[in-house]
Amino acid sequence: MIKKIFLLFFILITSNISAQEIAVLQYGGGGDWYSNPTALPNLIQFCNDQINTTISRNPKVVKPNDVDLFDYPFVHMTGHGNVFFTQEEAKNLRDYLLSGGFLHIDDNYGMDQYLRKELVKIFPNKELIELPNNHVIFKEPFSFPQGLPKIHEHDNSRPQAYAIFNEGRLVLLYTFESDLGDGWENPEVHNDPQEVRLKALRMGANIIKYAFED
């Protein structure tokens, strides 16, 4: 019995050591960076179960000017309202992205008008480019022939996926008019049909896979 307990403890310890960590971005400006609290943990569980990732089940929280930012290969950002980066934060985010990091921004409806002007601080000489439906991020491991799926309807606008590239590498993905994070939340939060939640989780898995491998 003691041996079994020790073995279980050893497995838990080694699995935690080998697990990859990802983070949520705690930005300034008053926007609700903390919205969709069950979203990322659910996406992590889905990815670990379905595409064999080994991501730590509890995402961390990181600020734009934290040195720890560089510890995470994938950082997620969401919210409904205002976003603000200081020049120091913008530089740190730029350095992070140019050093191999990946930022996924999911507009939870209401962020767009604030976000776009702050992205200019990070990359003053780069523009958001809409991804075509045949981009690899919509192909692997799950196929989305029509591109970014629509998860929540707000104003009858089509879902759009925008990107910023550096030397051919996609470093920032901005999902707009889709609301992927709402689809990742616990079922009882939005009462989405299972097929809608599955679309959101599968698209999220594609993003995670792309961020980790490209």
PLM feature segments, named:
Residues 18-74, 78-81, 171, 179-180, ...:
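Aromatic-Pro/Gly-enriched surface loop or interdomain linker
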Residues 54-63, 105-108, 126-132:
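Surface-exposed patches in mature extracellular/periplasmic domains of secreted proteins
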Residues 48-52, 98-101, 120-124, 212-213:
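Sec-exported extracytoplasmic/periplasmic mature domains
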